[in-house]
Amino acid sequence: MKIATLAVVSAFAATAIAGPIRPDGVVNDKFLIELGPGETQWVTKQQKHEMRAHINSIYKAGQGFVDITDEFGTDFTTAEVVPANYPKSALHAAVVNPMIAGLSKENLMRDLNTLVKFNNRYYESPTGVESATWVFNEVQKIIQASGVKGAKVEKFTNKFKQFSVIATIPGASKNTVIVGAHQDSINLKDPMKGRAPGADDNGSGSVVVLEAFRNVLKSKAIQAANATNTLEFHWYAGEEGGLLGSNNIFKKYKADGRKVKAMLNQDLTGFTKKGNPEQFGLITDNTNAELNEFCKTIVEKYATIKIIEAKCGYACSDHASAHRNGFPSSFIAETNFRNTNPYLHTADDVIANLDFNHMLEHAKVVVGFMGELAMTPNL
């Protein structure tokens, strides 16, 4: 998760440029980042990390970024939003409720305990590759146990070491519904070797998506191949470096003409601040308003806690990759960000700080989102 303040961005204002034009003397240790539509600048990797370090300060809607170095010299343009027709109410409780009944807090605990044992899940470290491999193997086991025909898992490779994981459940149409979470973590003091359990950021979102996937595959409707739309479950590499993995995926989907009708992001799903009401935070900036309304419907139908609107700034997480490539996206987080987890990006982002009941509520929302849209005709 990335929430940097405007003050940090202004510290690098002297190097800002109007567009992606490589200045004289810029070499391979500089990276082109996008701070907003059409607003770019060249920074070092250390500067990228420094921009992120302020996530632990009191939250205010700040300036995230997308690393678009690989887009330099291309004709990238923001695509028109893929049109979609979302239901005004939840219509498939008969499909979704059995999925919810199968959700297991014990599974969430077990899977998260595995993820936090990696020294870190940094996208350029050996253990970052090992953690991605664990996710891939676990998804493969779940598919094999389900017996669902056509379900598959793939590695989406990048120019950096860590790969993303994509699981697909085919539907009758090519219209695609996606839920995603980044599985990388970072210790900002020592990204490559530092301890970064990343329990909340974003082991919590990763295991929520994994548990949702497990129970969607157990659905009788899914096993009978009755889904109207294709479902994908994503675990992204390199979010902490500037949405690297997710942006690579959605750029390819745009180039391939994919019909992604909805994308739900799960980043930070486990922290609740004592003394504050338990709630979801629905991010309203750089997301799709119509899909956000559908998300409210899902929360009201299938979860037991309230949802409030919040903002997180440009490119704060992977939903922004879908959004900038023309795909409708939403982001439901653990809080409104004023009460965000104070331990993010440190060695202290550990399981002891998390609430698995809250994570279970996120899992209910994910299976509600995926189950309802799986069965929606003319999406």
Curated annotation (Swiss-Prot):
InterPro entries reported in the protein's UniProt record: M28_fam, Peptidase_M28
Binding locations of Zn(2+) 1: 182, 201, 267
Superkingdom as given in the UniProt entry: Eukaryota
Keyword Signal: yes
Glycosites: 202, 226
UniProt keyword terms in alphabetical order: Aminopeptidase, Disulfide bond, Glycoprotein, Hydrolase, Metal-binding, Protease, Secreted, Signal, Virulence, Zinc
Transmembrane intervals: none
Disulfide bond annotation, renumbered to this chain: 312-316
Signal peptide boundaries: 1-18
EC number(s) recorded for this UniProt protein: 3.4.11.-
GO MF term (any one): aminopeptidase activity
Subcellular localization, as worded in the UniProt entry: Secreted
Cofactor note: Binds 2 Zn(2+) ions per subunit.
Location (main, coarse): secreted
BP term (GO), one: proteolysis
Pfam family, one: Peptidase_M28
Function noted in UniProt: Probable extracellular aminopeptidase which contributes to pathogenicity.
Protein family: Belongs to the peptidase M28 family. M28E subfamily.
Subunit and interaction comment: Monomer.
Name of the protein in question: Probable leucine aminopeptidase ARB_01443
Organism for this UniProt entry: Arthroderma benhamiae (strain ATCC MYA-4681 / CBS 112371) (Trichophyton mentagrophytes)
